[in-house]
């Protein structure tokens, strides 16, 4: 089978992750990260041929300068690789209700991404910049750009899952509903779980837990999403690195009325100063929480709240599985590496038949997948995610 090389771009507000992946076998030829955009220390780091390299982009550099560097410096050193590029895949955080699957980028698609900016004000504008710069930098691939939406996998949710108990007109007229996030990751690990269990995806019932600086849980029934913890925005749901997740909405009124905080201040509090950072008042890093759980009250407090919330979601989503749960799957930076998070969470779910195997749990870290429960237990798995591969495969499929 001939190779299908795809450039995968993930543009954030102040960074750009990139990789060149062979969609036929998953081989990663180049990967890198440009970061600190708009700052004096803007830099780019990349790996190629097993070696790591780094360079300054220049003070104030952003997406345009980063893509220019990728094209004119990194790929210029690999002309054969550059000549074999067949498509460009773009990760898009929010596609609203308009996009239920990946699509080739057109003017209509660009407008749809713009229309979803209110629901992803930091991410979607950056994605649009990435698309515009890719179209300029790779004119030969102008009709080979593909948008892959984090929200698409969740578009199979039934109405009872995605509607809020608000006036229905807010949904009909303004699109206020649950959309979810991390859909590409939830889809990937669901596929991998089906392979491990030797079961068709359409018959698979799993609960997938994508745990990183942002985190979400998804109920997958018969291979399709039927509920997910993130909502209109990625603020709802689990305790995250700096995001609060679920809370009583009246707290917002109290912060404003009784404490004099502005809407902008409350937004900053809930999105950038809460979660693990808020609970520890030290850091958003789960490694600190895990390393200091036994000795520091702030770490124990944060870990206990984090795992309590996660266990509640897993427990409640079990009720949506029509009487059969094949597995719980952990993925993402925390899900793949924080053995303590997995153990403390599953220990709360003994009633559902989970019993952790300590040795297996400790072994399934640092990129290693595997079963983490005892043979007599209900199954829990660690499966490292690979969102970039899904994006590359979708881009290759749609542009074939």
From Swiss-Prot:
Swiss-Prot/TrEMBL cofactor(s): Mg(2+); Mn(2+)
GO MF term (any one): magnesium ion binding
Site (Transition state stabilizer): 182, 243
Binding site for ATP: 17, 210-214, 285-287, 333-337
Pathway(s) of this molecule: Metabolic intermediate biosynthesis; acetyl-CoA biosynthesis; acetyl-CoA from acetate: step 1/2
InterPro entries referenced in this protein's UniProt entry, alphabetically: Ac/propionate_kinase (IPR004372), Aliphatic_acid_kin_short-chain (IPR000890), Aliphatic_acid_kinase_CS (IPR023865), ATPase_NBD (IPR043129)
Role this protein plays: Catalyzes the formation of acetyl phosphate from acetate and ATP. Can also catalyze the reverse reaction.
Keywords: ATP-binding, Cytoplasm, Kinase, Magnesium, Metal-binding, Nucleotide-binding, Transferase
EC numbers for this chain: 2.7.2.1
Species in which this protein is naturally found: Yersinia pseudotuberculosis serotype IB (strain PB1/+)
SUPFAM superfamilies found in the cross-reference section: Actin-like ATPase domain (SSF53067)
CDD domains listed in its UniProt record: ASKHA_NBD_AcK_PK
Gene Ontology process terms (BP): acetate metabolic process; acetyl-CoA biosynthetic process
Binding site for substrate: 91
Disulfide bond annotation, renumbered to this chain: none
Positions of the catalytic residues: 150
Record's subcellular location: Cytoplasm
UniProt name for this protein: Acetate kinase
Top class in the EC scheme: transferase
Entry's Gene Ontology cellular component terms: cytosol
């Amino acid at each position: 089978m001939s190779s299908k090389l795809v450039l995968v771009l993930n543009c954030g507000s102040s960074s750009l992750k990139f990789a060149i992946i062979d969609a036929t076998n998953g081989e990663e030829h180049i990967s890198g990260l440009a970061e600190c955009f708009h700052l004096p220390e803007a830099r780019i780091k990349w790996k190629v041929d097993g070696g790591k390299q780094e360079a300054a982009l220049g003070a104030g550099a952003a997406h345009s300068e980063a893509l220019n560097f990728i094209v004119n410096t990194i790929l210029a050193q690999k002309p054969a690789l550059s000549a074999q590029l067949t498509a460009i895949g773009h990760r898009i955080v929010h596609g609203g209700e308009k996009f239920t699957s990946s699509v080739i980028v057109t003017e209509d698609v660009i407008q749809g991404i713009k229309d979803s900016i209110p629901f992803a004000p930091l991410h979607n504008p950056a994605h649009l910049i990435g698309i515009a710069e890719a179209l300029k930098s790779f004119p030969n691939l102008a009709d080979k750009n593909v948008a892959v939406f984090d929200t698409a996998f969740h578009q199979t949710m039934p109405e009872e899952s995605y509607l809020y108990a608000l006036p229905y007109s807010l949904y009909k007229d303004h699109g206020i509903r649950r959309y979810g996030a991390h859909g590409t990751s939830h889809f990937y690990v669901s596929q991998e779980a089906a392979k491990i269990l030797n079961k068709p995806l359409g018959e698979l019932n799993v609960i997938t837990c994508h745990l990183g600086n942002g985190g979400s849980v998804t109920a997958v029934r018969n291979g399709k999403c039927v509920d997910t913890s993130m909502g209109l925005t990625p603020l709802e749901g689990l305790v995250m690195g700096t995001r609060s997740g679920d809370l009583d909405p009246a707290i917002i009124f109290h912060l404003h009325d009784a404490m004099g905080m502005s809407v902008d201040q409350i937004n900053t509090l809930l999105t950038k100063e809460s979660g693990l950072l808020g609970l520890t008042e030290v850091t958003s890093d789960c490694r600190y929480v895990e390393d200091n759980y036994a000795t520091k009250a702030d770490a124990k407090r944060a870990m206990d709240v984090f795992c309590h919330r996660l266990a509640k979601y897993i427990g409640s989503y079990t009720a949506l599985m029509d009487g059969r749960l094949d597995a719980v799957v952990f993925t993402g930076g925390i899900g793949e590496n924080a053995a303590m998070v997995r153990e403390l969470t599953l220990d709360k779910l003994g009633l559902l038949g989970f019993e952790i195997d300590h040795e297996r749990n400790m072994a399934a870290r640092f990129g290693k997948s595997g079963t983490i429960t005892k043979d007599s237990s209900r199954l829990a798995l660690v499966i490292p995610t690979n969102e970039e591969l899904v994006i590359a495969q979708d881009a290759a499929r749609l542009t074939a």
